[in-house]
C-alpha cells in the first residue's frame, strides 16, 4: 500500500490523476465473486494460504488514506532537499518517510489485520483443508455443529441444550473479539492520529 500511495502523493509523478481514477474505479465497480474465484483458481491458489492473502493484499480505500497522509504530512521541500543531497527515492522513502509515518502505518496494519481476522467468507470459498481454516471459520463450524433440531427430545433436554448453545455462542464471540481488543489499546494513539488526517489544524 505504501509503495503505491507514496508515489501518488508526489506532484512530480506523471499521470497520477489517471492512476487515482483507476484505483477509485476499482473501489466502486467490483469485478464480482465468480471472476475473482476463477482468477484465484487459474493462479493455482485454491486450498493455499495465498488465496486469502494475495486478493486482499492491497485495498483502494487504504491507498487513498495513505496517499492523503503523505500529501499532508510529508512536505515537497523535504523531498527536494533530500534529492539535492543525492538521496534516491527509495532511500528517502525508507529513511525519511517511513519513520515519519508511524501513525498511518499503525492505521493500515490495524485495518488490514481486523479485515483479515473477521473475514471467513474467502476461507469458506477457497480453502478445502480443515488444517488451513482460520479461527473464524473454525468457530463458525463449531457453532453450526452445536445447533440442534427439535425432534423427539424432552422439553428439559431441549432447554438445557439451548442454554449450552447460547453459552457456546457467547464464548465464541469473546474468543473471536479478544485478539483485536488486546491489540487496539497499544495502537490507539497511532490510530486516532492517523484517522484525523486532513482535519482542520489550528
Language-model segments: residues:
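A hydrophobic, multi-pass inner-membrane permease signature
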Residues: 1-202
Amino acid at each position: 500500500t505504501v509503495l503505491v500511495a507514496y508515489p501518488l502523493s508526489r506532484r512530480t509523478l506523471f499521470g497520477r490523476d489517471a492512476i487515482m481514477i483507476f484505483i477509485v474505479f476499482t473501489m466502486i465497480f467490483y469485478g464480482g465473486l465468480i471472476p475473482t474465484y476463477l482468477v484465484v483458481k487459474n493462479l493455482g491458489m485454491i486450498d493455499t494460504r495465498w488465496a486469502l492473502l494475495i486478493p486482499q493484499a492491497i485495498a483502494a480505500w487504504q491507498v487513498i488514506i495513505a496517499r492523503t497522509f503523505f500529501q499532508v504530512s510529508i512536505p515537497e521541500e523535504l523531498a527536494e532537499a533530500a534529492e539535492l543531497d543525492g538521496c534516491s527515492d527509495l532511500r528517502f522513502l525508507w529513511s525519511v518517510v517511513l519513520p515519519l509515518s508511524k501513525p498511518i502505518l499503525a492505521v493500515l496494519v490495524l485495518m488490514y489485520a481486523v479485515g483479515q481476522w473477521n473475514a471467513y467468507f474467502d476461507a469458506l470459498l477457497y480453502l478445502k483443508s480443515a488444517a488451513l481454516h482460520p479461527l473464524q471459520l473454525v468457530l463458525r463450524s463449531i457453532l453450526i455443529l452445536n445447533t440442534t433440531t427439535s425432534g423427539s427430545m424432552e422439553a428439559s433436554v431441549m432447554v438445557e441444550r439451548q442454554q449450552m448453545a447460547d453459552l457456546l455462542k457467547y464464548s465464541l464471540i469473546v474468543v473471536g473479539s479478544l485478539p483485536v481488543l488486546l491489540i487496539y489499546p497499544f495502537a490507539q494513539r497511532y490510530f486516532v492520529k492517523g484517522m484525523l488526517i486532513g482535519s482542520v489544524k489550528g
